[in-house]
Amino acid sequence: MTKKIKIGNLYIGGGEPIRIQSMTNTKTKDIEKTVEQILRLESLGCEIIRVAVPDMESAKAIEKIKAKIHIPIVADIHFDYKLALEAIYNGADKIRINPGNIGGPEKVKKIVDEAKRYGIPIRVGANSGSLPKEILEKYKSPTPEAIVEAALNQVRLLESFDFDNIVISVKSSDILTTIKSYEILSRRTSYPLHVGLTEAGTFIAGCVKSSIAIGHLLLQGIGDTIRVSLTDDPEKEVTVAKEILKGLKLKKGVNIISCPTCARCNVDLIKIANEVEKRIGNLDLDISVAIMGCAVNGPGEAKEADIGIACGIGEGLLFKKGKIVKKVKEDDLVDELIREIYSLYKT
């Protein structure tokens, strides 16, 4: 079990729930837009938010942003240690740094000293695309062993300053390299691990690659926070991350079962399924909901679902646990299903 540490108003590691993290893509100094985006991400289930801090104006904006949101905020720092200090002074709940590009151990120590004084953790780690020259010379390529060694070198630097409030990540854009790196790291440290596939790509490719890597690691008990990194709206990152956790039974949530449709289907099931998902997808209710295009798939094949509908011609069946409850007109099917789900939710 990893060490438990506190980030803002929540804990990670040590048996705590796996936390969903994302990162804003607004200009951090644009406080209004950044807050708006974070609040949307919160509503979808984001539990930790990271913001880039490229300049002093962004670092100073953290105070006003934090005052309007409800989840811990992480400052992402590169190159200038003074940005980290300013972010800490303005209320950052956690700092993410790469000690190798901050400007030497003495500057890292200044960050560590303030992080200790304010009681906030630091995330360090290695990415396959930015390994130190000496590591690449030793291993010839960004192997998992190289990535882990680079990350642990950063950890040892922080530990040399008597600091152990640490989170580690070891990311690659390659699925197998990412998995192997975290497997090695998890055997060599008890610090909490932030898991993700870096630069995973556009929506479909990124979802697939991240789901494979993150899911594989979580099944082994590796990972305390996760981020699905996508070249897309951060809201999609949170939704996909939540689906990964729900799929592995690591988080409560509605599980929607729906058939792929065929010639027997006489309704626009894709539209119906998407509407149901939109209306109930964020409920913290541990049930399975089936949306089937014909009587073949439901309620028979979907009898394991807690509740569902099977569409016909002009009408459909509402069923619970495989037993038909009532016939419903086609136009009323979705609303009736939602009403029944909310009645379950209230109980």
Curated annotation (Swiss-Prot):
The gene is ispG. This is 4-hydroxy-3-methylbut-2-en-1-yl diphosphate synthase (flavodoxin). GO terms for molecular function: 4 iron, 4 sulfur cluster binding; 4-hydroxy-3-methylbut-2-en-1-yl diphosphate synthase activity (ferredoxin); 4-hydroxy-3-methylbut-2-enyl-diphosphate synthase activity (flavodoxin); iron ion binding. Keywords: 4Fe-4S, Iron, Iron-sulfur, Isoprene biosynthesis, Metal-binding, Oxidoreductase. Binds 1 [4Fe-4S] cluster. [4Fe-4S] cluster binds at C259, C262, C294, E301. It comes from Caldicellulosiruptor saccharolyticus (strain ATCC 43494 / DSM 8903 / Tp8T 6331). It comes from the Bacteria. It catalyses: (2E)-4-hydroxy-3-methylbut-2-enyl diphosphate + oxidized [flavodoxin] + H2O + 2 H(+) = 2-C-methyl-D-erythritol 2,4-cyclic diphosphate + reduced [flavodoxin]. Pathway: Isoprenoid biosynthesis; isopentenyl diphosphate biosynthesis via DXP pathway; isopentenyl diphosphate from 1-deoxy-D-xylulose 5-phosphate: step 5/6. The keyword Transferase does not apply. Its cofactor is [4Fe-4S] cluster. SUPFAM superfamilies: Dihydropteroate synthetase-like, Nitrite and sulphite reductase 4Fe-4S domain-like. Converts 2C-methyl-D-erythritol 2,4-cyclodiphosphate (ME-2,4cPP) into 1-hydroxy-2-methyl-2-(E)-butenyl 4-diphosphate.
